[in-house]
Amino acid sequence: MENVNKQSFQDVLEYVRLYRLRNKLLRDIGDNDRKIRDNQKRVLLLDNLSQYITNDMSVEDIRAIIENMRDDYEGRVDDYMIRNADLSKERREIKEKMKAQKKAHAELLKKADD
């Protein structure tokens, strides 16, 4: 019985660890979503700004800078989307581990009662 309690306690600790990790991943995903949205807004802002700048203003250098900034922001959006996909995958894996652990714990308790 003591082994069952010890194993049960270890299972609970592992479950809590996984639960916290899952919540951290959810927070990271939310943070990345905000970063994606912010950078998409910056891309739109730069697109609008680019429409107002004309060659008559002799700002070819400014256009080049804006284009570089736009490319940089688009790259960041892509990077955050990739990172979000990785975090979501890890979150799903943790959720499956938690589900399996919960099932195993229930079976362990059932065996202990028998």
UniProtKB/Swiss-Prot annotation:
Matches recorded under InterPro entries: DUF496
Compartment annotation: Cytoplasm
Source domain of life: Bacteria
Chief localization: cytoplasm
GO cellular component: cytosol
Pfam families in the cross-refs: DUF496 (PF04363)
UniProt keyword tRNA-binding, yes or no: no
Family note: Belongs to the pole-localizer TmaR family.
This protein's name: Pole-localizer protein TmaR
Organism whose genome encodes this protein: Mannheimia succiniciproducens (strain KCTC 0769BP / MBEL55E)
Encoding gene, per UniProt annotation: tmaR
